Design a protein with these regions (language model features):
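Acidic, glycine-rich two-metal-ion catalytic cores of nucleic acid-processing enzymes
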Residues: 197-215, 219, 223, 310-348
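Heptad-repeat amphipathic alpha-helical coiled-coil interaction surface used
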Residues: 145, 152, 159, 267-270, ...
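Eukaryotic low-complexity, Ser/Thr/Pro- and acidic-rich intrinsically disordered regulatory regions
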Residues: 140, 215, 283-284, 347
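Conserved catalytic/binding loops enriched for acidic/polar residues
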Residues: 183-185, 306
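Non-catalytic accessory segments flanking enzymatic or RNA/DNA-binding domains
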Residues: 1-171, 176-179, 192-208, 212-220, ...
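Fold-core signature of tandem repeat domains
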Residues: 162, 166, 263, 267-270
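Intrinsically disordered, low-complexity segments enriched in Gly and acidic/Ser/Thr residues
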Residues: 279-305
Length: 348
């Protein structure tokens, strides 16, 4: 995880002729590290000014830990207000709301950063065989984790269904114009190295580049995660209504009673919920892991046995440097993979 701190800046713009401040605001970040020692929000302002016919100014700056994560969550939280890239269209009330959200996320990031770092460190430490007793606080956090995880899963399922609908529509010339405004099909093709064939043909060379690696491994398992059946209406009635109404919306679109643009708006709301659930899950998970420490788990909350595992893997980078012609011989173009890209903003 990237723990780099930095600044979240709000850049506004002013019309040079009328002197009127527009409702467009760029919400971006500046990382605070050795590579960016001479960069600041003021420097970014000057860079953004190039090519912009309106005068730019810094509306506000929020300093924060986890600056990349905070910026990502902020844009997801307010996806329906985004227009393109990092730009948002905000009235005075909405601007204040986004700024307050940035400050709140920064405050929470400051509190959680130490636990997130500690949790990453603990993942690299072998555990004992001992389970420790739970506490009411940890049991409550486990519920938060389970609820957040369930929401993320449901969001993912609905978002995938939306992408399938858009993908089908983009294959229909009568619907491309409507759907192409907020969704596109992207094709990718990656080269594939046939490791097994190379190993069979050049076993001696292959053996020279097989590297043993000792790592601590152990997947955390949260109590109740496999059989979680809690109804959404019991902990988030608003989200329950969205889930319950989704099938009806899809049916109406299939019957031509609703435009597919509605689904794009729905997908933006899913991004907001995803951001909230991701943040809640991260906070609960890191706190539980830190409480678990080097123990094998917490009774009724988490099982997290970790032990050293030795694995062997091919050092492909070193092999390619030493035998580029052989690697090229066993490398071929992979299948073309199509992905549906849904606009994360409402720029129309």
């Amino acid at each position: 995880m990237n723990f780099t701190p930095g600044e979240i800046y709000f850049i506004g713009e002013k019309d040079l002729r009328t002197k009127q401040i527009t409702s467009y605001y760029k919400v971006g970040l500046v990382r605070e590290n050795a590579e960016n020692a001479d960069r600041s929000s003021t420097q970014r302002l000057l860079e953004h000014q190039t090519g912009n016919p309106r005068e730019l100014y810094i509306e506000s700056v929020v300093k924060t830990d986890l600056v990349e994560l905070v910026e990502t969550l902020l844009h997801k939280n307010f996806a329906p207000l985004g227009v393109r890239g990092e730009w948002m269209l905000l009235n005075a009330t909405q601007l204040s709301e986004v700024q307050k959200s940035a400050e709140q996320l920064a405050s929470e990031a400051k509190e959680i950063t130490a636990d997130l770092k500690k949790a990453e460190e603990l993942a690299k430490v072998a555990s004992s065989d001992e389970l420790i007793p739970s506490t009411p606080e940890l049991l409550a956090l486990n519920e938060v984790y389970l609820e957040s995880n369930a929401k993320l899963k449901a969001c993912g399922e609905m978002f995938n269904a939306i992408k399938d609908i858009f993908a089908e529509a983009l294959q229909d010339e009568d619907e491309v114009e409507e759907v192409g405004v907020f969704a596109q099909i992207q094709e990718r093709q990656r080269s594939v190295f046939d490791e097994e064939a190379f190993k069979s043909a050049h076993s001696a060379i292959y053996a020279q580049f097989v590297v043993p690696k000792a790592t601590i491994k152990g997947t955390p398992s949260f109590a109740g995660s496999k059989g979680f059946k809690k109804d959404f209406k019991d902990f988030d009635p608003g989200f329950a209504s969205m889930v319950d109404g989704f099938t009806s919306i899809v049916e109406k679109i299939g019957l031509g009673q609703e435009k597919k643009e509605y689904l794009h708006g729905f997908s933006l709301e899913l991004r907001r919920i995803n951001a909230e659930a991701t943040w809640s899950k991260m906070k609960a998970e890191s706190t539980i892991k830190v409480a678990c420490g080097t123990h094998a788990g917490i009774d009724g909350v988490i099982k997290w046995a970790r032990s050293e595992k030795v694995t062997e893997s091919l050092d492909k980078k070193a092999l390619k440097l030493s035998h580029p012609e052989l690697v090229a011989e066993f490398t071929s173009a992979g299948d073309v993979v199509k992905a549906i890209i849904v606009d994360p903003k409402k720029g129309y």
